[in-house]
UniProtKB/Swiss-Prot annotation:
It comes from the Eukaryota. One of its GO terms (biological process) is pentose-phosphate shunt. One of its GO terms (molecular function) is transaldolase activity. One of its GO terms (cellular component) is cytoplasm. Its main location: cytoplasm. Transaldolase is important for the balance of metabolites in the pentose-phosphate pathway. May play a role in the conversion of sterols into ecdysteroids via NADPH. This is Transaldolase. Pathway: Carbohydrate degradation; pentose phosphate pathway; D-glyceraldehyde 3-phosphate and beta-D-fructose 6-phosphate from D-ribose 5-phosphate and D-xylulose 5-phosphate (non-oxidative stage): step 2/3.
C-alpha cells in the first residue's frame, strides 16, 4: 500500500505501514466492546438484585471477617 521510493524522503510512510496492522487490531477490540456497555449487560443479565437496607448492610458487614480490618485501615 505504501511505496516510498526512498526512506529518507518520507519516513512517516514506513512508520504508518508498520503500525497499520496494530491500529486495525485495536479498532476491532474497540468495536467489540462498543457493542454493549457494562451497565446494559448487568441490567439485562439474570443477576440477583439485592434489597439493601441499613440494617441489612450492617448485618452483612458484621458477617464479613475482613470488615474489622478495613475499619482499622481507614483510621
Amino acid at each position: 500500500k505504501y511505496k516510498p521510493t526512498d526512506a529518507t524522503t518520507n519516513p512517516s510512510l514506513i512508520l504508518q505501514a508498520k503500525f497499520l496492522e496494530e491500529l486495525q487490531n485495536s479498532k476491532k477490540i474497540y468495536n467489540y466492546y462498543k457493542k454493549e456497555s457494562v451497565v446494559e449487560h448487568l441490567s439485562e443479565s439474570s443477576a440477583k438484585k439485592l434489597e439493601m437496607t441499613e440494617a441489612n448492610f450492617r448485618w452483612e458487614m458484621n458477617e464479613d471477617k475482613f470488615a474489622v480490618d478495613a475499619v482499622k485501615l481507614e483510621k
